[in-house]
Each structure stands twice: as C-alpha cells, then as structure tokens.
C-alpha cells in the first residue's frame, strides 16, 4: 500500500509539469477508483432477505433491494464509499415495519464499473426516487458518503422528508480532496489540476460544494447526527457544523465506536430507533 501511494505521488508530481492535462485526468482516475471489497459474511443475510430489482441507468443499472413491510412507511438506506447495502443488515430486524429501499452506489459491491464520484452516486439516488415515486413523507438513514449523496440528491427534488439520520456525516466536499492530497502527498500544482478538472466535470466550484448549503434546499422535519468524536475517516467537526446550522437537528456524540463499526453498535442502533 505504501509503495502504491509513493508511486502515485511521484507519477502525479512529475506529470504535473510534463503533461498537466494528463495529470489532472490521472488524479481524478486515482481518486474515483473504488476498491472492490468482498461482501462480508455478516452482511450476506441482507441479500438473502431482500427482493432485488434494477433501475435503468446509463452505463450500468442501479441495483436496488426491497425489504420489510410493503405497506409500511418508506425508508431509504444509503451506504458509504467502498461499502455496500449489506452494511445495514444489523438494522433490519428492528425496521421490519417499514418498506425499506436500499441501493448499491455506482461501481460498488457487485457492479462491474470501477470508477465513480459523489455526483454520479447522487444521480443514481435520484433515479431510484423517480422509480419509487414517493407520495408521502419518508425517512432516510445514510452512512458516511451516503449523507452527502442523500443531501445532494434530495436538494434537486421536491421530495418531502420526515426524518434524516446521518451516521458520520461529512460537510465540505473540498475537505475530502484536501485529505486525498495529504494521503498521497502530491504537490499543490497537482491539486489545482485536480480541482480544475473536477469543477469542469460537475459544473460547480469545489469550495462551494457543502452539505450544509445543499441541506437548506431539502424539505425535512428532523435530522439526527451520530458521530464518533475520534472518527479517523470523517472528522467529528463536520457533524458539529451541521448541528449548529440546523435548529431541527440533534447531535449525539460517541467515543471509540469507529467509522464503520458504528453500524454494528447496539447503542447507535438504539438511538436511531428512538429517533
């Protein structure tokens, strides 16, 4: 892993001077590549219980899963980066009264595609919403990147949401790219090329892409934020900013429950169910 990081760093730094256009493309390719992770044994029961269906999408269809009570209140589950819908399997026995809809983010889990980004994931969620056509308020439980995907998708719809639950939410998308620069250790020239290419792709300035700004456009009643104070993937401060911004939010801090492990924590589950 360290060797690969060093190789990518060296390659990006050199090409930033010799072939800047290629460097920008290469940086985006490295950033958007999804590491293919095997479905964990504890996640497999999710797929055994679910009814699978697909929503048409250019490239590769969106794999969707329905569980629970077909006549219950609608609840969407949105997983995070390099994860899969099975990460919510621990929640299923306690959500059986709901009509649960989950979907696999592009290029994740069983998908054949290998690269994606938050905007593609956002568009995938919008396609799922268009397919389901909610007629009443619904709930969303989202983890990690899923909170951004949820926010950006809903901000571009007229959907009425009852409760939002964000587990380890991020806020500034720009921070994700800055952390990527820190991880690989490439120079500022590479970062500027990466930033320029991303902004051209999505049509938005990176510095203006924030969950707090987009969430203002979402019609929702309540927001629950749960975050580990020592989360090593997404800083706790992200949830603090969102909580301070929205009066109809509640922030519950935890310690040492991890970023992914929190999805298997009984106390976290209890707080979600109480909400």
Regions found by a protein language model. Name each.
Residues 232-238:
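Conserved alpha/beta-hydrolase "acid-adjacent" motif
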Residues 141-150:
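Gly/Ala-rich beta-loop-alpha elbow adjacent to hydrolase catalytic centers
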Residues 115-133:
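Alpha/beta-hydrolase active-site loop
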Residues 85, 92-112:
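Conserved alpha/beta-hydrolase
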Residues 218-219, 224-227, 231:
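Short beta-strand/loop motif that positions the catalytic acidic residue
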Residues 156-204:
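Hydrolase active-site cap/lid region
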Residues 2-54:
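An N-terminal hydrophobic leader/cap segment in hydrolases
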Residues 257-267:
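Catalytic histidine-centered segment of alpha/beta-hydrolase-like enzymes
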């Amino acid at each position: 892993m360290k060797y690969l990081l060093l190789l990518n760093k060296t390659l990006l730094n050199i090409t930033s001077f010799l072939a800047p256009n290629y460097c920008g493309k290469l940086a985006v390719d490295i950033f958007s590549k999804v590491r293919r992770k095997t479905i964990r044994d504890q996640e497999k029961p999710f797929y055994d219980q679910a009814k699978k269906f697909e929503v048409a999408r250019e490239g590769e269809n969106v794999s969707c899963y329905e569980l629970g009570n077909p006549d219950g209140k609608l609840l969407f589950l949105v997983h995070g980066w390099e994860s899969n819908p099975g990460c919510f399997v621990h929640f299923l026995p306690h959500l059986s009264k709901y009509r649960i809809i989950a979907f696999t983010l592009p290029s994740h889990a069983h998908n054949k595609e290998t690269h994606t980004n938050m905007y593609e994931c956002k568009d995938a969620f919008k396609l799922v919403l268009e397919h389901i056509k909610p007629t009443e308020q619904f709930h969303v439980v989202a983890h990690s990147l899923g909170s951004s995907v949820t926010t950006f998708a809903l901000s571009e719809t007229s959907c009425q949401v009852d409760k939002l639950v964000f587990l380890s939410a991020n806020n500034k998308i720009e921070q994700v790219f800055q952390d990527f620069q820190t991880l690989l250790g490439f120079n500022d020239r590479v970062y500027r090329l990466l930033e320029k290419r991303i902004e051209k792709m999505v049509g938005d300035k990176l510095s203006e892409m924030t969950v707090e700004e987009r969430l203002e456009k979402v019609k929702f009643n309540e927001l629950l934020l749960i975050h580990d104070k020592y989360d090593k993937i997404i800083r706790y401060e992200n949830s603090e900013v969102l909580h301070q911004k929205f009066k109809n939010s509640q922030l519950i801090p935890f310690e040492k429950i991890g970023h992914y492990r929190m999805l298997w924590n009984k106390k976290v589950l209890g707080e979600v169910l109480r909400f």
